[in-house]
Amino acid sequence: MPKISVIGAGNVGATLAQRLIEKDFADVVMLDVVEGIPQGKALDISQSANVLGFSHTITGSNDYAETAGSEIVVITAGIARKPGMTREELLAINQKIMTDVVSNCLKYSPEATLVVVSNPVDTMTYLAWKLSGLPRKRVVGLSGVLDGGRLATFVARELGVKPSAVTPCVMGEHGGSMVVMPRFTLVSGKPLSELVSAEKADELAKRAVNGGAEIVAFLKTGSAFYAPSASIAAMAEAIFTGSGKVMNCAAVLDGEYGLKNIVLGVPVKLGKGGLQEIITLPLDGTENARLLASAEVVKGQIAALSL
């Protein structure tokens, strides 16, 4: 049976595993280093099969051998930045975690496509690509699907349309330097830049950029996981089914947008084996400058890795 593995059984990983098994296109293995957590959560999710009608199995495990033969491996493992911790300290810890995860995943699933979720996601996707030695098409990261979903929500509320009527375009770093592209964000086929003022577009963009932080401010002791898990599940489904769907993802660039040897959020086509095509948009001078500025932020993070 086809298989997808999720590494990490925290809020994002477990909710993702639930969404994947409910889509019912593959068996799901949820792995975590903490004994009992993935097993208990998988058992709980499995007991909804009769109610929801899915037929594939979900398994929780602490053993990477259970992930063998996965077509897709989603990596959510990593720690969040704690008070007093420098970015360099966070990167060092998450680099060690990513090194262990990539090594073990590819040991049992050498043909898998890797989908990276761990933060800072652009840098961790770059690290996974370097560690794995895989072709760039087989390593992608979550970025613009989530950021675009946030943008679409705020645009839809502003214009009184359904979120599904919005085709968002968000590029660059998954973070503070993220670049919203109003000219390429469409609402029922019309550019957002033609529907709202530049000031309103900036306001909507800022809210999308701060979407995750806004949720953290409400929750106090946690961060977003419902929208992230839905975004990852959509990426996994596009890869698994070979749909060729256009999504904004963190991808390894090799000359696109004048950038090389870096991971950055750009529009891509996802299909069998991962990245089918990077779509190069005709950016104007201002848009290109903002994208390059965002790339500099990611370059700084990559430079802090021990490679």
UniProtKB/Swiss-Prot annotation:
The keyword Oxidoreductase applies. InterPro entries: L-lactate/malate_DH, Lactate/malate_DH_C, Lactate/malate_DH_N, Lactate_DH/Glyco_Ohase_4_C, Malate_DH_type3, NAD(P)-bd_dom_sf. Gene3D superfamilies: Lactate dehydrogenase/glycoside hydrolase, family 4, C-terminal, NAD(P)-binding Rossmann-like Domain. Its EC number is 1.1.1.37. The active site is at H174. Keywords: NAD, Oxidoreductase, Tricarboxylic acid cycle. One of its GO terms (biological process) is tricarboxylic acid cycle. One of its GO terms (molecular function) is L-malate dehydrogenase (NAD+) activity. It catalyses: (S)-malate + NAD(+) = oxaloacetate + NADH + H(+). Substrate binds at R81, R87, N119, R150. NAD(+) binds at G8, A9, G10, N11, V12, G13, D32, N94, V117, S118, N119. It holds the Pfam family Ldh_1_N. It comes from the Bacteria. Belongs to the LDH/MDH superfamily. MDH type 3 family. Catalyzes the reversible oxidation of malate to oxaloacetate. This is Malate dehydrogenase.
